[in-house]
């Protein structure tokens, strides 16, 4: 389910967004969405690494990401991350 957010960015992130927006002829929303998605991907990979090292359970990772166990399994599978 899509979520709409409004936020204020600090200067360095705003400068980055404006630079990318100009270079790629993209909207601010598209650039910010890409940044958020990249951050989420990194979070998923970090949680996966912790799971692989035995620092937390699969169920705990699912809870941290707000997913069911089945959804997390599917997400890891989609990203080619071993379960």
Listing of model-derived features with the role each one plays in the protein:
Residues 33, 63-83:
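Charged, low-complexity intrinsically disordered terminal regions and linker tails
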Residues 1-11, 82-83:
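Short Lys/Arg-rich basic patches
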Residues 18, 22, 37, 74-77:
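Residue-level detection of the helix-turn-helix DNA-binding "recognition helix"
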Residues 42-65:
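Short, positively charged interaction helices/loops
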Residues 27-48:
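Short, basic amphipathic alpha-helical segments that act as recognition/interaction helices
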Residues 10-30:
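Surface-exposed, Lys/Arg-rich phosphate-binding patches that contact polyanionic backbones
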Residues 25, 55-56, 80-81:
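Residue-level recognition of short, well-ordered coil/turn positions
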Residues 16, 31, 56-60:
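A general alpha-helix detector
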């Amino acid at each position: 389910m899509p979520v709409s957010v409004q936020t204020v960015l600090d200067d360095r992130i705003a400068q980055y967004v404006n630079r990318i927006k100009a270079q790629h002829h993209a909207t601010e929303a598209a650039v910010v969405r890409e940044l958020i998605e990249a951050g989420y991907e990194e979070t998923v990979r970090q949680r996966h690494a912790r799971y692989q090292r035995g620092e937390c359970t699969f169920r705990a990772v699912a809870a941290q990401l707000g997913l069911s166990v089945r959804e997390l399994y599917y997400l890891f599978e989609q990203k080619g991350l071993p379960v």
